[in-house]
Amino acid sequence: MPKQQSRTADLVSQYMVLTKETMPHLARTSHRHWPVQNDHCFQRIVLDAVCEGVWYDYLLRPAYKNLTHDQAANAVDLCNDIISGDTDLITLNKQSLKWRGKILT
């Protein structure tokens, strides 16, 4: 496997652990103020932010198998920024829902 693909796969694995395990656990414990708790919600929010729109308008499904290296790296960075509090999950969730027509401005 080429080096770039290997690194992309590692980033995707990190993204999956962060959104499927780490962030849901934090949402149920130390980060109860977060607006979501389920893994698919974290994935929606992060992927929408990375794609700057509804992710499935930009990526084939399943998204994790179709992320570019840059998208995977951005997703991991964004997850870490959300966890550290450097990026506001509430704001990202609202933007994601706006893109999806779920809430009005």
Which residues does each predicted region cover?
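Positively charged, phosphate-engaging catalytic surfaces used for nucleic-acid and nucleotide handling
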Residues: M1-T105
